[in-house]
UniProtKB/Swiss-Prot annotation:
Gene name per UniProt: pdxY
Name under which the protein is recorded: Pyridoxal kinase PdxY
Pathway(s) this gene product operates in, as recorded in its UniProt entry: Cofactor metabolism; pyridoxal 5'-phosphate salvage; pyridoxal 5'-phosphate from pyridoxal: step 1/1
Residue positions binding substrate: S9, M44, Q45, D221
Function as written in the Swiss-Prot or TrEMBL entry: Pyridoxal kinase involved in the salvage pathway of pyridoxal 5'-phosphate (PLP). Catalyzes the phosphorylation of pyridoxal to PLP.
Length: 286
C-alpha cells in the first residue's frame, strides 16, 4: 500500500485542507500521514474561529521523528497545500528534499494555495517563494486559474493560453499540471472546467457548476487529494483526471442536494471510490 505525507491546514469542524484530503485518499486505498500546518476550530469564512499555526521548526522535527523510527523511506509521495508563512514554505521544501533523499522514487505534488484558503491568506513572501522556488522541486502542481496566472506571470483567458502556460511551467520542473478550475471565456456559464497537461498531452474535462448560496470550502483540497491518490495507485494521468472530475462532482452534488455548506465527504464516500456518473476528458490540441 502506498504512503503519502500530506502537509496542509486542518479544521476540527468541517472539511478544508487535510480535513478534506485525508479521508478521500484513505477511501482510495492510500495510507495518509497528515502533517497539519494550521490547526483551527473551523475555516474562517464562518466569521469566528480559534486556533493557530504550527512552528516551522516543529514541522521538520515531526518529520525527523518519522525518520528516526525508520519509516520515512516508505513515503511514496508528499502532497503540500496551505503553507501560511515563508518559514513554513521553506520547511515544506526541506521536508520534500529529506523524503526524496531517503526514497529517490518518491514524488512531490504541490497544491500552491496562494490565494485565500478557507478564509486564510498566506503571509507576504509565500506566494513569491512558491512561484520562484517550488516548480524546480515539484513533480506535479495543481493551481487554480488565478494561481496558474501567478505561476506563469501572464493573463489567461482561453484553453489554448492555459495549455501554453502549463507547458511553460512544465519546462521549469513539474511533469504534470492539474488546473483545478479553469475559466474559459468560450465555455458555457453553467459548466466547471478542469485541465490536465503533460509535456506532450493535454486533456480538458467539464462537470456541472452548481449555484450554491455559499460555495463550500475545500473543493480544491479534495481535488488535489483524489488526483494524487489515483496516481499513487497506478492510474494513468488521463484515468486519474477523469476519476477526479467524476468523484469531485459526486461530492459537490451530494453537498448541493443536501443543502449543506460543508462538503458531504462521508455521505459520498462510495462515489469517491467508484463514481457512478462520468464525464470523460477529451484531448485538446491547443
Amino acid at each position: 500500500m502506498k504512503n503519502v505525507l500530506s502537509i496542509q491546514s486542518h479544521v476540527i469542524y468541517g472539511h478544508a485542507g487535510n480535513s478534506a484530503a485525508v479521508f478521500p485518499m484513505q477511501r482510495l486505498g492510500i495510507n495518509v500521514w497528515p502533517l497539519n500546518t494550521v490547526q483551527l476550530s473551523n475555516h474562517m469564512q464562518y466569521g469566528h474561529w480559534a486556533g493557530s499555526a504550527i512552528d516551522a521548526a516543529k514541522m521538520e522535527q515531526l518529520v525527523d521523528g518519522i525518520a528516526a523510527i525508520g519509516v520515512l523511506k516508505r513515503c511514496d509521495a508528499v502532497l503540500s497545500g496551505f503553507l501560511g508563512s515563508p518559514p513554513q514554505a521553506r520547511a515544506a521544501v526541506e521536508i520534500v528534499r529529506t523524503v526524496k533523499a531517503m526514497n529517490p522514487n518518491a514524488w512531490y505534488f504541490c497544491d500552491p494555495a496562494m490565494g485565500q484558503t478557507g478564509g486564510i491568506r498566506p503571509e507576504p513572501g509565500v506566494e513569491e517563494f512558491i512561484v520562484e522556488e517550488v516548480p524546480a522541486l515539484a513533480d506535479g502542481m495543481s493551481p487554480n486559474h488565478t494561481e496558474l496566472q501567478k505561476l506563469a506571470g501572464r493573463r489567461i483567458e482561453t484553453v489554448a493560453e492555459a495549455v501554453d502556460a502549463c507547458r511553460a511551467l512544465i519546462r521549469r520542473g513539474p511533469q504534470i499540471i492539474l488546473v483545478k478550475h479553469l475559466h474559459d471565456r468560450n465555455s458555457p456559464a453553467d459548466r466547471f472546467n478542469m485541465l490536465a497537461v503533460t509535456e506532450t498531452e493535454a486533456w480538458i474535462g467539464q462537470r456541472p457548476l452548481y449555484a450554491f448560496p455559499r460555495h463550500p470550502v475545500g473543493v480544491g483540497d479534495l481535488t488535489s487529494a483524489i488526483f494524487v491518490a489515483c496516481r499513487l495507485r497506478g492510474d494513468s494521468v488521463r484515468a486519474a483526471f477523469e476519476h477526479t472530475l467524476a468523484a469531485v462532482h459526486a461530492v459537490v452534488k451530494a453537498t448541493y442536494d443536501a443543502r449543506r455548506y460543508e462538503l458531504e465527504l462521508v455521505a459520498a464516500q462510495d462515489e469517491i471510490a467508484r463514481p457512478s456518473e462520468w464525464f470523460g476528458a477529451w484531448v485538446t490540441d491547443a
